[in-house]
Amino acid sequence: MKSGFGEGAYFITRSVYRDQFREKLGFDPFPGTLNIEVGDPEIVERIREGAPVIQGGGGFGDVLYVKALLNGVVEGAILFPLKTHHRQGCLEFVAPVNLRKTLKLRDGDTVSLDIDTSEIQE
């Protein structure tokens, strides 16, 4: 994992997304994302394919999402903003808690994700 641009907090707190996060993810995300580097960008594309969508609006782009479990402990979701500055091998994870504090994470730490495929369309 690595530090990001600090933009996640801004976008997550926009009402156009926040209301849908509550409805579709079942939680109110902590304002910020955990950026997870994945060695193979093709893995990211496979996870992203068929992911449900959170509609943007008012100049904000759509966001695809997949529910996941981080380190076997924290339920959250991987977000795939259709407008992003991140390279393809980076996942953005959100959860209802501050993940760095809750899991005592630092840049360079390795994390695991268990993907919930129940909402992915084939």
Curated annotation (Swiss-Prot):
It is an enzyme of class 2 (transferase). Pathway: Cofactor biosynthesis; FMN biosynthesis; FMN from riboflavin (CTP route): step 1/1. FMN binds at T84, E92. Its EC number is 2.7.1.161. The keyword Nucleotide-binding applies. It catalyses: riboflavin + CTP = CDP + FMN + H(+). InterPro entries: RibK_CTP-dep (IPR039063), Riboflavin_kinase_archaeal (IPR023470), Riboflavin_kinase_CTP-dep (IPR023602), Riboflavin_kinase_dom_sf (IPR023465). Keywords: Flavoprotein, FMN, Kinase, Magnesium, Metal-binding, Nucleotide-binding, Transferase. Binds 1 Mg(2+) ion per subunit. Catalyzes the CTP-dependent phosphorylation of riboflavin (vitamin B2) to form flavin mononucleotide (FMN). This is Riboflavin kinase. It comes from Methanothermobacter thermautotrophicus (strain ATCC 29096 / DSM 1053 / JCM 10044 / NBRC 100330 / Delta H). The lineage of its organism: Archaea, Methanobacteriati, Methanobacteriota, Methanomada group, Methanobacteria.
